Amino acid sequence: MAIEDGSGIPFDAWRLVGGLEVALDVDVLFGAYPDRDGPPGAPEQVLRLLGGHRIRAAAVASLRAALFDVRSGNDELIAHAAPEVVPVGVVDLRDPVGAARELERLAAEGVRAVRLFPDEQGVEAGFPSVRHVARRAARLGLVVLTGGDVRRFWQPFAGLGADVVFLDTHFYHLGDFLVAAADEPGFHTSTRLLNSPDALELAAAELGAGRLLYGSRAPHYEPLVPLLRLATSGLKPEEIAAVAGGNAERLLRRPQS
């Protein structure tokens, strides 16, 4: 290796990221997972991490709400709301009746989105509770951010006219998302796991860059990886800006009708 040809220079991801900033990250969590190693997820620590990665605002959900107590976790998050935090409500899919009531309460509080944690709550896409919550969220005009395998979790939202962001779309399963989303204009995906050489470009070519939203899952995943993939993609500058927050702003900060 030689310095002259650049091969001996250490890899500098930030040099490749350049001036890219994220206006709104669609996948951020406050709190910790009690059953795994990881950061405590204190709000001030998470916001500091985001700032260090040029992420100016985030759609944030509470792991306390997802894993322990829905209402107190949601209330704690709503109380923390700041310009850089878009609060995202959480419901318990194991309690569909209570979940529907919580959706009504969240909507009345002005919350614009709800996040589903099917894997953490042990709920499968075919359970009646998921379809029930999907219908109620659509009726209330709430944007749904959902985990789970997109090959299964697209089904409960089909035909509802809902705005849904699939947070766990892996590039292995991108084709399934593309064919499902072709008939559902409200289907969107996080870019967190679309880190193959052509996943972003393929999705933009098939559906338009308006269906892609930058997501990091900070602080439990590394924000730099999807940031680097977006910065080095073959998308046009205006498409990159849309993915880096413009699309999320359109969904999550639009005026309520």
List PLM regions with ranges:
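Active-site neighborhood of phospho(di)ester-bond hydrolases with catalytic His/Asp-centered motifs
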Residues: L24-V26, A59-S62, V88-V90, R115, ...
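Mid-to-C-terminal alpha-helical segments outside catalytic/metal-binding sites
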Residues: M1-V26, P40-A57, L224-S257
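Divalent metal-dependent hydrolysis catalytic cores, especially in the metallo-beta-lactamase
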Residues: A23-L29, Y33, D37, E44-F68, ...
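Catalytic pocket-lining loop regions of alpha/beta-barrel enzymes
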Residues: G126-L213
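Active-site environment of divalent metal-dependent phosphoester hydrolases
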Residues: G31-Y33, A65-D69, R94-V97, Q121, ...
